[in-house]
Swiss-Prot record:
InterPro entries: Bact_solute-bd_prot1, SBP. Keywords: Cell membrane, Lipoprotein, Membrane, Palmitate, Signal, Sugar transport, Transport. It comes from Bacillus subtilis (strain 168). It is found in: Cell membrane. Its main location: membrane. This is Arabinooligosaccharide-binding protein. The gene is araN.
Length: 433
């Protein structure tokens, strides 16, 4: 009975996709326009593409595009995309795929996504290479990211000054630990917070050391020595109260926003795109937050990581593959498009060569909020070559889920397992697939 119910739901979803596909085919724009269907799970991304369609239509008046955007809930969109690719019906022309789900579309040898490598070949040296590697398999690029996700440390300067600690003196994680002890002693507040239901803290810190869940050859390294030692380091800082588990489990929870907005901790490690969360959910910190590189694990070590991400893809089964690819290259591969990624979305663009452009220095809500707001991209330019690639494997989504759901909670929150035990168990589950 359960199997019949599942089959019925899948058939109904397929029928919905077919009907949606037929509707898209029947609807046509003005004479000379080609309609492209775009699926996303983030309504904000639609704003960016609306702007880029306007720019495209100005530049190519004889090849105008009408964008039909469908915004689905996160899980539904990824499920719909998988089913439509299998069925060969109702396939969008372009679609967003979030990092944690991307590996699901790279399985096997017959990858259903168009090769985007030629789109950026001419200017490849202008892109942050780690973010191209992230969405590649066997040397072919299958998605263009929406940002670099340069990971930094956000310091609450009110707390830091009260403790007599200068963030510019923090060069290594040991420096951070020592500074945190002083912050705790003087102010009674933790130096930072650690996510226990999301991997931002842990993954950034192991990526700094050129580690991850898989190596470049697809070998599982989730429980290697680097990862075990890093998780132990976080556990030690929690136990000596230098850091605490993030209220609500992560840095996107209402509990955390309220805690941090009241000056709850001296710092938080997150990608630069987290600026938007400060503005939207922590208004009382305006003018108090300074952005700095991450501490390195040793003097001269890497001071950043590339975190999070949503890549835009072109399914091979799109009815307008070539046009969709050209538009995607224009939107996310051009200098103009990369400047829009900042001005419309507040994201650090994939092309580092626009980071020093005047458009990225103009005052806006981001520059106004942060203490060193007008120098944000000066910080990022200084660390752009210190971002190591994260290698996606077809089991990356499962590995990520295990880390978020079990490893971090068991090792850091409940501490019912040692870091080694938690990572060994997760690695064992992945090997049993």
């Amino acid at each position: 009975m359960k199997k019949m119910t599942v089959c019925f739901l899948v058939l109904m979803m397929l029928l919905t996709l077919v009907i949606a596909g037929c509707s898209a085919e029947k609807s046509s724009g003005k004479s000379g326009e080609t309609e492209l269907t775009f699926w996303t799970f983030n309504g904000l991304h639609e704003q960016f593409y609306v702007e880029m369609v306007k720019e495209w239509n100005k530049k190519y008046p004889d090849r105008k595009i009408k964008l039909n955007t469908v915004v689905y809930p996160y899980g539904q969109m990824h499920d719909n995309l998988s089913i439509s690719l299998i069925a060969g019906e109702g396939v969008p022309d372009i679609a967003d795929v979030e990092l944690a789900r991307f590996s699901n579309f790279l399985k096997g040898s017959d990858i259903p996504l168009a090769d985007l490598t030629p789109l950026i070949e001419k200017d490849r040296d202008k892109f942050v290479e780690a973010r191209l590697t992230l969405y590649s398999k066997n040397g072919k690029l299958y998605g263009l990211d929406t940002h670099v996700g340069t990971t930094v440390m956000f310091y609450n300067m009110d707390v830091m000054k009260k403790a007599g600690v200068n963030p510019d003196d923090i060069k290594t994680w040991d420096d951070y630990h020592k500074a945190g002890q002083k912050v705790r002693k003087v102010t009674g507040k933790p130096m930072g917070t650690v996510e226990t239901n999301d991997s931002a803290t842990f993954l950034s810190m192991i990526s700094q050391q050129n580690s991850g869940y898989f190596d470049k050859n697809g070998k599982l390294i989730l429980n290697n020595d680097t990862n075990v030692k890093t998780l132990q380091y976080l556990k030690d800082m929690i136990n000596d109260k230098t850091m605490i588990p993030a209220p609500g489990g992560g840095h996107h929870s209402e509990e955390y926003y309220g805690f941090m907005n009241q000056g709850g901790a001296a710092s938080v490690l997150m990608p630069i795109w987290y600026m938007g969360r400060f503005i939207d959910y922590m208004p009382d910190l305006k003018g108090k937050i300074a952005i700095r590189p991450l501490p390195a694990w040793k003097e001269g070590g890497d001071r950043s990581a590339g975190l999070g991400g949503t890549a835009t893809v072109v399914p091979k089964q799109s009815k307008h593959v070539e046009l969709a690819k050209e538009f995607l290259a224009f939107a996310k591969g051009s200098e103009e498009g990369n400047k829009k990624l900042w001005s419309v979305l507040g994201f650090d663009p994939l092309r580092w060569d626009v980071w020093s452009s005047k458009e990225l220095k103009e005052k806006n809500k981001y520059t106004d909020y942060f203490q060193n707001g007008t120098g944000i991209f000066s910080v990022l330019l200084d660390i752009k070559d210190e971002i190591n690639p994260i290698y996606l494997h077809e089991d990356f989504a499962k590995a990520s889920d295990l880390v978020n759901r079990s490893v971090l909670f068991d090792a850091l929150k409940s501490q019912q397992k040692t870091p080694k035990q938690a990572l060994d168990r997760a690695a064992g589950e992945l090997k049993q697939k």
